[in-house]
Amino acid sequence: MKQLLLLGAVLFITSCGDEPVPKPKAYLRLDYPTPDYNRSTEQLPFSFDMNSISQIEEEVKYNAEDGSIGVNIDYPKLKGTVYLTYKPVRDNLIDLLRDAQNLTQKHTIKADEIEGSLFENDENRVYGMFYEVGGNAASQSQFYATDSLRHFLSGSLYFYAKPNYDSIYPAAVYLKNDIKHIMESLQWKE
């Protein structure tokens, strides 16, 4: 009788369970607006097109000692910022180029890859490099641009969140395209 009760209990417990079904894959639905660009209106030695979902942080940082200017373009909805640094060229172009390239190379520790692409806009006298950094690096995109004579601008994209590449990838791609548009629309003021 005990064996019959035990057998009945085992059958009851095992027969009531649902068959395990794997959960379907879920994908984030991230809708980013189509970029709408307007010309920057800041009092800077350069101008560029800005995405309407971005804003320049209130405080533009001027350094009277070396003439450098720091401008932060904030993307609140994407939790990212593009940090721009302008420096006048004063017989120091090689140093400025080396510093910009070294900043990118500092990310090789965490980066899976760093892909650089040359940028040239003869009409506006803008020449530079755009770097796309793959992997869990702190900065996903970096660039520098110069006219080789008077102006030098560098920029880096950083997110407010821990750099988990899979999570920030869609926003990084969107902002990468914005940074490329900044480079393409960049004009030096004489």
Regions found by a protein language model. Give the residues of each.
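Signature of long, low-cysteine stretches enriched in small and polar/charged residues
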Residues: R98-S154
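Positively charged n-region of N-terminal signal peptides that target proteins for export
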Residues: M1-L4
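C-terminal motif of bacterial Sec signal peptides marking the signal peptidase cleavage site
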Residues: F12-S15
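Bacterial lipoprotein signal-peptidase II cleavage site
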Residues: G17-K23
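Post-signal peptide N-terminal segment of mature Sec-exported envelope proteins
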Residues: P24-P45
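Secretory pathway targeting signatures of secreted, lumenal, and periplasmic proteins
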Residues: L44-R98
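Surface-exposed amphipathic alpha-helical segments
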Residues: S156-E190
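Second-shell loop/turn segments in exported
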Residues: V82-R90, Q142-F143, Y165-V173
